[in-house]
Amino acid sequence: MADTYEIQRRAMVEGQLRARGIRSAAVLQAMAKIPRQLFVPEAERVNSYINGPLPIGFGQTISQPYIVAYMTEALELRGSEKVLEIGTGSGYQTAILAEIAAQVCTMEVIPELSCGARELLSAVFNYKNVIFKIGRGQEGWPEFAPFDRMILTAAPGQFPEVLFAQLSEGGIIIAPVGGVDQRLVRYSKRVGKIEATDLIGVIFVPLV
């Protein structure tokens, strides 16, 4: 018999994701599988599947389910990619990526969040394709570059161009950019040149 969280998770996938245009079978499957309630503080678990962000401590948030799905779908993952995630946060987006991508390299500047996500993903999910690092995302992770995909879960005022050098040819970056007025932007690399495509308006915590 399905528990309450499982029922809420199914409703989230149908009502918040599929109904709003998320079509990637891999993304929908991952979102239906990962128990979001494990990634939020106990006091917020009753709100785990609402269509909104939730606080996770240290001034950070876990993004609303639709935005997680939208950004993941926009990465156009096929299953063979190495992904750089800047902003591990709770580890929820990390888990979604780990379900689809070949390898996930995830960075977080707040040690407590990085350690908490590492412990959760290791103990509960036993992922073997996730590598963690505590550090500033603006600098990227040159030791593991190049990356086929990158995703930022916090917004820089201006996109750190050093990351473009760490992106593979044909690679894609999905990132919120801006201050008060933020836009989600898709960057793609073709023949060494970067093309930027504006997607939607968003609200993220600033990249620090």
Where are these regions (language model features)?
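Conserved nucleotide-cofactor-binding alpha/beta core module
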Residues: 76-195
